[in-house]
From Swiss-Prot:
Xref: InterPro entries: GOSR2/Membrin/Bos1, SNARE, v-SNARE_N_sf, Vesicle_trsprt_v-SNARE_N
Record's subcellular location: Golgi apparatus, trans-Golgi network membrane; Prevacuolar compartment membrane; Vacuole membrane
Function text: Functions as a v-SNARE responsible for targeting AtELP-containing vesicles from the trans-Golgi network (TGN) to the prevacuolar compartment (PVC) and mediates liposome fusion. May be also involved in retrograde traffic to the cis-Golgi. Promotes the formation of vacuolar membrane 'bulbs'. Necessary to deliver proteins to the lytic vacuole, but seems not involved in storage proteins transport. Required for amyloplast sedimentation in the endodermis during shoot gravitropism, which are thus acting as statoliths.
Source species of the chain: Arabidopsis thaliana (Mouse-ear cress)
Phenotype of gene-disrupted mutants: Abnormal amyloplast sedimentation and gravitropism in both inflorescence stems and hypocotyls with elongated stems in a zigzag fashion, due to narrower angles in internodes mediated by aberrant cell shapes. Reduced formation of vacuolar membrane 'bulbs'. Altered transport of proteins to the lytic vacuole. Small and wrinkled rosette leaves. Fragmentation and vesiculation of vacuoles mostly in cortex cells of the inflorescence stem in comparison to endodermal cells.
Phylogenetic classification of the source organism: Eukaryota, Viridiplantae, Streptophyta, Embryophyta, Tracheophyta
Entry GO CC: host cell; late endosome; plant-type vacuole; plastid; trans-Golgi network; vacuolar membrane; vacuole
Coiled-coil regions, chain positions: 32-93
Gene Ontology biological process terms, A to Z: gravitropism; intracellular transport of virus; lytic vacuole organization; protein targeting to vacuole; vesicle fusion
Pfam families xrefs: V-SNARE, V-SNARE_C
Record's subunit section: Forms SNARE complexes with the t-SNAREs SYP51 and either SYP21 or SYP22 in the PVC, and with a much lower affinity with SYP61 in the TGN. Does not interact with SYP41, SYP42 or VPS45. Binds to EPSIN1. Interacts with SCYL2B.
Name this protein carries in UniProt: Vesicle transport v-SNARE 11
Gene name, Swiss-Prot/TrEMBL: VTI11
Length: 221
């Protein structure tokens, strides 16, 4: 059910009960008092029409399963409003005799009692709906807070994991640097070893040549 529609309905029920009482009291009044009371009634009827239009607009924005039941209520409210308008016309016509006035007064009193009971029932239903809505809002708020706490915990865990990844990245970067340095050292050592091989080879060749020269001179003497 729409909370907005419920609010308009509650206002209309209160206004309807007030109009019923004013119509009943206007029957027994004369002169300026009657004019003042009729002015109040007409102002109330205008407010009632505004509320009905608002309820109609709100009902038509709702899903079909809700809209149908609310439109039935609206027809009842419109019929109730038309009855008030008819009664106001009869009161303002000035053609009521004493018997008719008494009859209308008694009918108005009966309608007031019936309307008051009906309004009380509707107000109680509206209050119960508001109570249930409040409970749902509290449950939703509690769920939202729990979800927020879980979200904060997840964010904290993600932050911790991010820090761990950053430290691991720094460690890997350091390892890469060490590997690069080690590779450079090995390259230098390999280059030196190759250089030493050539040097040793040259020395060996020189020694062999010297031996051959010595042997040659000894054999030729």
């Amino acid at each position: 059910m729409s909370d907005v529609f419920d609010g308009y309905e509650r206002q209309y029920c209160e206004l309807s009960a007030s109009l019923s009482k004013k119509c009943s009291s206007a029957i027994s009044l004369d002169g300026e008092q009657k004019k003042q009371k009729l002015s109040e009634i007409k102002s109330g009827l205008e407010n009632a029409e505004v509320l009905i239009r608002k309820m109609d607009l709100e009902a038509r924005t709702l899903p079909p399963n809700l809209k149908s039941s609310l439109l039935v209520k609206l027809r009842e409210f419109k019929s109730d409003l038309n009855n008030f308008k008819t009664e106001v016309k009869r009161i303002t016509s000035g053609q009521l005799n004493a018997a008719a006035r008494d009859e209308l007064l008694e009918a108005g009193m009966a309608d007031t009692k019936t309307a008051s009971a009906d309004q009380r029932a509707r107000l109680m239903m509206s209050t119960e709906r508001l109570g249930r809505t409040t409970d749902r809002v509290k449950d939703s708020r509690r769920t939202m807070m729990e979800t927020e706490e879980i979200g904060v915990s997840i964010l904290q865990d993600l932050h911790g994991q991010r820090q761990s990844l950053l430290r691991a990245h720094e460690t890997l970067h350091g390892v890469d640097d060490n590997i690069g340095k080690s590779k450079k050292i090995l390259t230098d050592m390999t280059r030196r070893m190759n250089k030493n091989k050539w040097t040793i080879g040259a020395i060996i060749i020189a020694l062999i040549a010297a031996i051959f020269i010595i042997l040659y001179f000894k054999l030729t003497k």
